Every structure is written in structure tokens, then in C-alpha cells.
Amino acid sequence: MWGFWLLLFWGFSGTHRWGMTTLAILGQRLNGVNECQDTTTCPAYATCTDTTESYYCTCKQGFLPSNGQTNFQGPGVECQDVNECLRSDSPCGSNSVCTNIPGRARCSCLSGFSSSAGGSWILGSPGHFLCTDVDECLTIGICPKNSNCSNSVGSYSCTCQSGFVSNGSTCEDEDECVTRNACPEHATCHNTLGSYYCTCNEGLEFSGGGPMFQGLEESCEDVDECSRNSTLCGPSFICINTLGSYSCSCPAGFSLSTFQIPGHPADGNCTDIDECDDICPSNSSCTNTLGSYFCTCHPGFASSNGQLNFTDQEVTCEDIDECTQDPFRCGRNSSCTNVPGSYNCSCLPDFRMDPGGSQAHGNFTCKRIPFKCKEDLIPKSEQIEQCQAGQGRNLDYTSFCTFVNATFTILDNTCENKSAPVSLQSAATSVSLMLEQASTWFEFSREETSTLGTILLETVESTMLAALLTPSGNASQTIRTEYLEIESKVINEECNEENVSINLKARGDKMDVGCFIIKESESTGTPGVAFVSFAHMDSVLDERFFEDGQASWKLRMNSHVVGGTVTGERKEDFSKPIVYTLQHIQPKQKSERSICVSWNTDVEDGRWTPSGCETVEASETHTVCSCNRMTNLAIIMASGELTMEFSLYIISYVGTVISLVCLALAIATFLLFRAVQNHNTYLHLHLCVCLFLAKILFLTGIDKTDNQTACAIIAGFLHYLFLACFFWMLVEAVMLFLMVRNLKVVNYFSSRNIKMLHLCAFGYGLPVVVVIISATVHPWGYGMHNRCWLNTETGFIWSFLGPVCMIITINSALLAWTLWVLRQKLCSVNSEVSKLKDTRLLTFKAIAQIFILGCSWVLGIFQIGPLASIMAYLFTTINSLQGAFIFLIHCLLNRQVRDEYRKLLTRKTDLSSHSQTSGILLSSMPSTSKTG
């Protein structure tokens, strides 16, 4: 049956040829033929098995039939080789190579492996195939010399030993000292076969000990040869350790005599260096010492570091100001002048050095000279020095120097023969001859005239003193010449009694000297006094030389020039005054004021000055002067008759009188009319009282200069009263501003809540503070020779102008702000109200506040340039009428006050007719009063 189905299969799928073949075979089988005898019955790689009925083919081991049947027949089926190497279980094992061959596989080991079964083993052969690693390193010579063999699975590797590098197939020695940084700093590298070693350089040692080492992590440390061997350089040298070596040097201040090789012991000697060639600063001396030096500042200098001896070259020697260290170094009546490295002592004017003392010995003393000589006058005047230098030959100086030399001749006769009697008569005659030629002096310049006048006055004074001091001159004398009259008196027993005065007269002039002045003058020996009166001297040393030449005064000399002197060292600052009574050359006019002036040689070359003397009394024929020193004196008449100033005086006088009347009426109004009394009228009252007192004192006391003490007191009160006026003006301005500002909120003056006591403390207290401070700082600032006011020649006037300028600025700002707020308020009210006739009145009141609050004082600042005259008239007119403005605004233009005036005049008392206050604001009354 099997054959039939096979035949059937092939019949359907094969070709006709194969069908015919199958039929033939089948026929043979049916005939009992052994098909296996035919070698072509089965395909290649198959075995044929004959059966009773047929046969079958079976593929050999390692092959598989193409039809997938284990037993098959007939051609068409092929036995295909099985690739055993593709099996997942790796038939040959690890580390092997499987090679497929027909019907089987051949196993061989990979390179580097071997098997006990041989190099090639057929799969299926007897035994077991296993590849194991071959250790190539066991083979001698497999790696080159100086290398190491490293076996690995299936292979090996050769690496050069440490210290060797590969060069192709050989290992050569590596020079580590060349190829890499093998040793640390300060070490030397030494190459060896296959290695290296390091050694520290000379003078250094390995930190780990030992002579040799390897590795950069090690270090070479310096060997301190100096500490290991203290005698290395010798006893007189200093051993200095260096890196890897040492050196020998001399101590500071010494030098080596020979060159020293570093790292070798010292050879030679150390010799001292003289550093003092140019090492100390200027103004110092250098002192060389063994191995060193030090600097010392010269006497009169001190080192900047405070040390007496120093070596620091940054230190300097600075001059010592001995005069500052000890202000009394030169003693009394002397001046100390610092000079580099020292100081100079000199005596004050009118003093001379005591010959028994010296600056060098520290006992420099000055004694008042009894009288001045030529050397005391020359240093004070440049003109005199020119004459002494021979420039008098110049035509411009000939006449002047002739007078100077003639005066010095008189002085030389007095000074050069101090022990010989002095002829006062002869000196007076010579001076008279010079005064006789006084008309020639008008050819001299102002400086030359004052210089010549000074030396002539000093010469006469010295001559009078010399006559009193010389033994033969101890007798009272009266010398009369045409141009000079002298009376001298020696005091014997006249001063034995207390309160006695010595009276001296000359040409109608008189000097009264109290005996207490004789005692205070510290006279030695028999004391004496002298008095002189010069004729014609007043014509040359006239009012042109007045120190305070005010443009507002006409000045004229109206007395002879007189002078007084007293023996003794002290001639000024006496406890009680010396009284001079000088006769007028012309009668004194009522409009004139007498000024006692003394000749001051410290101002330029000489000037008349009122300081030191006071006018005690002035009549038509005489003026009495009180001076605190012996001086040269004269009387200058001052009068204010210039047109412009006189007209301003009249305006000021009339305006002040009008203001006083108005202020008196305003004060009476605020005090007597109870209906108008309120917080505002109290403020007006205080301002009116201060202005009234200030103006009446100004009117009656500004020119009371006869008594300087009383004049200073008047000036102090004026200072206080005018300051109080301005402080109350400030209070008025602030209160007015607060009232207007509060109109925006409610028609009520909330500033009423400010207590009047506080306002009084401000208005009266602050001026007191200013005056006290001013008087303490500058007590001589009150009172001048021509008016009882603050001294305008110094900055003392700013004790008044400073506060005034500040208050004017504040008041002006507050008033501007007030007017701006008021304008807004008026614009916001009913238009009918704004058209009332009161608008013009309110505008007038607003403008008037400028004058009431003192803002017009700013006009005084603009009294300069071409507008000075206009500003002066405006300033004088407006400010003199300040009281009138106050009365006009606060009284006459106030309806309530006018009603009170009307009641007073008509004696009607209608208490029900009270109206509200006038002038919305600027009358300084409550807010909504009416005006009419």
C-alpha cells in the first residue's frame, strides 16, 4: 500500500518521466528484486535498507532528508548536511573554533588554548574535546630583556620593567632625570639602570633623613650653618644664613676690608663706617659711634618724633617756637620774636634793654626809657629812614629832610650828653624856629607832615624829661617863646598830703595832675612833671589827621596842641584821669561839639584819635578833657552843617516828634479804652511802648558824647530798645499771618490761645540775651566820639544788624504770604462784597503793614550808588514816621476806636452801639469788623 500511495504522490507532483520510472520500479518489486543493490536507489549520504516488500532510504548521521521523513524511498529526496556548529550548546566548548564539514563538525582551539584531544577533533570521535589556556610566559625568551611577561586568557603581554621604556621589541633604560620632574626643588637627580635617586643640593638636607630619596613629595630643607656652628665666621663677624649656604658680614656700622666669598669663613677685619657724611637732616648734627651713629637736632630745634637722639632718616628737625612755649621768656615790657633755631628779645616802644641783663644768660629785662632818642624814632618811619640813607639830596626830600635833621640835632643834644645839664631854653628856641616856618610844612605830603609832627612832639617831650632828670635841672622852669611855652615842676613836698593836684599852665591851657598819678608813675629819684603848649602846630597837624573823618561832620581844630609828661616808667593806664583844660582859639558855636583827641603814633605815621580821652565839659571858651595817660592833646570841633545831612536831620527830627506824639496817643488809647482791649491791642501796646522809649532816648541822648561812660550806657539801652522793637514786630507779623491763615477754616483768631507771658519772654528776653552777649564779647563797642551808638568802625555793629536783617527777611516773607492768602479769601467772597468801597481802604492797610512791621528798613541796604540820596530820604522819612503809621492803622482807621473817640469828645455812652472791629485783617483786630 505504501508503494501505491508513493506512486500516487509522485504521479501528481512529478513529471511524466518520473511517473514512468516509478512504474518500472514497482514492477521490479513485484518481481522480488533487491532494490538496494542499485546504488542510485537512495540519494547521496543515505543508506538503503531492503525490506520484504520494498526498501527505504535513511540519511546518514549528520544529514537530514529534504522531505523531513526519517525513512524515505525514491529519488527526489536529498540528504542535506546538518551544520552542528550552529547549535546553541556549542558542541566544541568554550575557547574553541567549530568548523562544519559534511555530516559532522571539526573542533579546534583558539590561539592561546590547547586540547588534550589534539589540535583538531571531529565531533563524534571518541574522547572529550576541551580547550584550556596556554601560559605563553612559560616559554623562555618570549619577552625581551628587562621586561615582564603577563599571561592572560588566550594570550600574554610584555611590559618593560620600572625604569625602562619600550623601544619597539626591546626595553631600554629610562633617564628619569631627563624625561620627567623626578626630584623636588633644591635637589639633584641621579639616573641609574632602571631607576634614579635624588640628593639635596649643598647646604640642604633631606627632611626624612638619609642621603638619597625619591619622589616629589619629599623636600630639601635649608641647613642653618650659622646656628650649628656659632664660630663659623669668627668673633667679630655676623653669620647670615642663606638658602643652601651662608655669608659672613660685618655688623651694622662696619665694613669688610676684603671681599668675602659666600659659604666660606670670613677673611679680613671689620672696620667702623663713619656714617656722618650726609645722613642726618638739616638743622642737626651727626655723632659717629662704634658701629653706628645718631643725629641730634641743633639747639632751638626738636625732632619730629620727640626723641633727643635718633637714627630714622624720616625724622626732621623742626624749629621750636620758644615764644609760644613761654610767652614771658623775654620778661615784661618786651616782645619775643621766633627765628629759626632761636628767638630774639626786643623791648616794647618806650623801653630799652637793661645793660645788666642779656638774652644769652636768660635775664633779659626791659626798663622804660626816661625819654626817646633818635634810634627809637627811626625804625617807625620809612620817610626818616630815607633821610638817614642819604636820599635827602633828592629835591623831593630836601626840605623835609632838612626839618628832620634839625629836629634830630635837638634830640641828639639831649641824648648824647645825658649826664650834662640840658638847656630847656635852647631846645625851646630851636623848636620855635621850626614852628615859625610851619607854612613850609604845607608843601609836604600828608605822611611827611605827620612824621615830622611826631618826631617834633617826641623831641620836645624827651627834652622836657631830660631837663627834669639831669641833676642841674631839678628846678621848676617856665620857658616862653613866641611859638612854644613850657612849664616844668619838680615835686618835692607838694604831694605829702592826700588829694593834692599839681597845676601847670602854658598859653592859657592847663593840666591838673593828681599826686596819685605821680606815685603810680613809678618815678625814681625826685619826680617831676612838665606841660607844653605849641603855637601853629594846630595849623599843620589839623583836622585832616583825625582818625574818624566822617562825611557827615564838619571838623576844625580849635585849640593849641598841648603835651604833658611825667618822670617815671609808667605814663598810661592810670587809675584816675589827668585833667586837661584847653582854651579855644575861636569861641565854640552851639551847633558844634568838642572832641578831645590825642596824637596816636601807632596809627599810620600819626593820627588824632578820641580813644583814651573823654570830653568832660565844653563851654564857649574852654573844653575840659579827662585822659588816662600823659599824651599830646588837642580839641577838634565837629558840627553837622552839610546840606544833605542837615535836611535829613530835620526830616528825622520832625518825623520822630510826630511819631512820639502818635505813639503816646496810641498807648493812651490801648490803655484807657477798655472796649477796644483784646489780645491784639496788647501786642500793639508792647510795640508802641518799645518804639516810644527807643525814639525818645534816641532824640535826647544820641549826641550826649561828653561823658563816654554815660554815652556807652545810652548806646546799650538804645541797642536793647531797638532790638525789642524788632522782636515785637516779628511777633506782630506771626500773629497776623496766623489770623489770616485761620480765615480759611473759621473766622476766629486761634492764636489768642498763645499766652501773653510767653510772648513777653520772647519780645523782651531775647534782646536782653543779645545785648549781654555783645557787651561781654566786646565791652568797648558801645559809644563813639560823635554819637552814642554801637561802634561802626568794627564788626560790633552786626550785633544789631544781624538780628534786624533776619527779622526783616522773616517779616517780609510772612507779609507776602499773608497778602496772598488774603487775596484768595477776598476772591472767594460774594462779588457784591468785593465791590465795596472798603476794598481801597484794605489795600491801603495792607501796604501800611510794610512800614509797621519794619520791612521798610530794607531801604537802608540800597543806600549805595547813584540812588543813595533817594534811598536815604525814603529810609529816613518812612522809618521816622513808623509811630504815625501805627496810630493811623490801629486807631484812626478802626471804626470801634473812632467810636470811642467820638464818645469821649461828645461824652455820649451808648453801650448798645458796639460794632465789630474794622479792617478785616490788617488793622490786627478780630476778623469781621466793619470799617467806615
Swiss-Prot record:
One GO BP annotation of this record: adenylate cyclase-activating G protein-coupled receptor signaling pathway
Domain EGF-like: 32-69, 81-119, 133-172, 173-210, 222-260, 272-307, 319-354
One Pfam entry name: GAIN
GO molecular function terms noted in the UniProt entry: calcium ion binding; G protein-coupled receptor activity
Organism: Rattus norvegicus
Top-rank lineage group of the source organism: Eukaryota
Cited SMART domains: EGF, EGF_CA, GPS
Disulfide bonds: C36-C48, C42-C57, C85-C98, C92-C107, C137-C149, C143-C158, C160-C171, C177-C189, C183-C198, C226-C239, C233-C248, C276-C286, C280-C295, C323-C336, C330-C345, C596-C625, C613-C627
Protein name: Adhesion G protein-coupled receptor E2
Domain GAIN-B: start-end pairs: 482-643
